[in-house]
Structures are given as C-alpha cells and as structure tokens.
C-alpha cells in the first residue's frame, strides 16, 4: 500500500494529509466545545485563550513526547528533524500532557472549572484521534505486525514485502470512532456530566484500554522493540492511563457536579 502523504503542492509549499488531520481535529473539537457548553460558562476570551494554548500544547507536547520517549538518539544527532511535524512522529501521551497543562493554565486565568472543561474536551478528542490515525495510515507509518489475514497490507516503510495489519485503522476505530460514541453516549444518556470529572476519567481509562489492546497488532517501534513482559512502550504508557482514569472516575463519584453552581 502506497499513498502520497502530500495533498498538493504550490511551488515549494506542500500541504500534507497528516497536517490537515490535525487542523480538522482541532476545528471539530473547538466547534463541539461550543455545542456542549449549553450553559454558556465559557466566554469568547476564554475560547480564544484555550484554543491558542491547546494548539501549542498539542504540538509541543506531542512532538517532545515522541522525541523523548520513542527516538531521542535520532533527534539528538539530527535536531532539525524535530521541526518536521508534518512527517508524523507525534506522541498521544505527550500531547495529552500538553493539552492538560494548556487547560489548567487557561482555566486558572479565566476562573473556569478545570474538570468541567476537561469533561467537554474529552467528548470531542476521539474525533481528533480518528483523523490523526488516518493521517498515520496515509503516511504509511505506525503499521501493524505481520499477518496472514486477507485484509493484510504491504507498507513500503516496513522495508519488506510482507502483509501486515493496518493497525492505524484499528486505532482509528477503537481509539477514535468507538471511543467517541461510548463517551458521548455515557455523557448524555447516563447524565455523567453531573459528576465532576467522570467523563474525563472514563475517556482516559477507555483510551488506555483500547490502546493497550491494539498494540498487540501494531509493530513495536524499531528503535525500542519489546520491553518488560514482552510489552511495547505504548502498552506500558497505557497502564498508568488506565489507573489514572479509574482514580479520576471514582473520585468524581464522591463530588457530584452541581450544574447550577458550577463556579
């Protein structure tokens, strides 16, 4: 399977599918945040501040997370490569930390409840993940392990001619589409939004579970390989996410979110 990562080029400037995926994900999350904030707690100044901070958090956190966790040697020897975000190489875990810091800073500055904001953001984030994984698929990166299944694909970046799981599409479905449906269904149908931080906890926990399971079909990063107990780096990073999500959810059950006194 070989798809061009470039949508089109105008002179020396190229527009990449991967970059477009990030832009569309952020635009959707921004629009969806407006839609979910039916109490109009957020002001225009807060939206603008949050959007700017989140974009910076995603780019810096995602890129630095990938550089420090997955391939520090390469980027130390070729630091200019750190700037080439359009070629892929973004860490969800690093990006999540960047977004968290962005939300905390923006909420503190505008006196907006942090977990209320995180809950609403958690409802829209899976669509960004879905689009990002499709971008990975188009780039032909983060491919799966060798398989004999009829839907196996050959990825030129693997350096061989073997059929592999299209694990990027598995992640797009489980970490993106399915997570979006489940989290939003719980948010609306089970009144989870009445419990401060519950949606955030569930989203973090379910993402960790989905990522841990899909990693069994994804080829480990060549520079890292398998680690403790034959697990991948992605799986090891997902374990604390699952535990953290559970703690946030259980903690939220003890502090019911009163929508009439949200401040």
UniProtKB/Swiss-Prot annotation:
Lineage, uppermost ranks: Bacteria, Pseudomonadati, Pseudomonadota, Alphaproteobacteria, Rickettsiales
Keyword Amino-acid biosynthesis: no
One of the record's GO molecular function terms: phosphatidylglycerol-prolipoprotein diacylglyceryl transferase activity
NCBIfam families: lgt
Subcellular location: Cell membrane
Name used for this protein in its record: Phosphatidylglycerol--prolipoprotein diacylglyceryl transferase
Keyword Transmembrane helix attached: yes
UniProt family annotation: Belongs to the Lgt family.
One GO BP annotation of this record: lipoprotein biosynthetic process
């Amino acid at each position: 399977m070989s798809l061009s990562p470039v949508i089109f080029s105008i002179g020396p400037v190229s527009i990449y599918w991967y970059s477009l995926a990030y832009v569309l994900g952020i635009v959707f999350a921004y629009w969806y945040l407006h839609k979910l904030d039916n109490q109009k707690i957020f002001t225009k100044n807060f939206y603008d501040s949050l959007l700017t901070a989140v974009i910076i958090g995603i780019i810096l956190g995602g890129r630095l997370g990938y550089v420090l966790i997955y391939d520090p040697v390469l980027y130390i020897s070729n630091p200019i490569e750190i700037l080439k975000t359009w070629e892929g190489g973004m860490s969800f875990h690093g990006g999540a930390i960047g977004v968290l810091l962005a939300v905390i800073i923006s909420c503190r500055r505008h006196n907006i409840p942090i977990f209320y904001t995180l809950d609403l953001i958690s409802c829209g984030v899976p669509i960004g993940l879905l689009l990002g994984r499709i971008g990975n698929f188009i780039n032909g990166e983060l491919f799966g392990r060798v398989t004999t299944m009829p839907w196996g694909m050959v990825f030129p970046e693997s350096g061989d001619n073997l059929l592999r799981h299209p694990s990027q599409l598995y992640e797009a479905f489980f970490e993106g589409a399915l997570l979006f449906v489940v989290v939003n269904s719980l948010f609306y149908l089970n009144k989870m939004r009445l419990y401060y931080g519950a949606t955030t906890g569930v989203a973090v926990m379910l993402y960790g579970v989905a990522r841990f399971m899909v990693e069994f079909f994804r080829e480990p990063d060549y520079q890292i390989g398998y680690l403790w107990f034959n697990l991948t780096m992605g799986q090891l990073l997902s374990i604390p996410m699952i535990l953290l999500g559970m703690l946030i959810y259980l903690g939220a059950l003890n502090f019911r979110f009163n929508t009439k006194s949200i401040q």
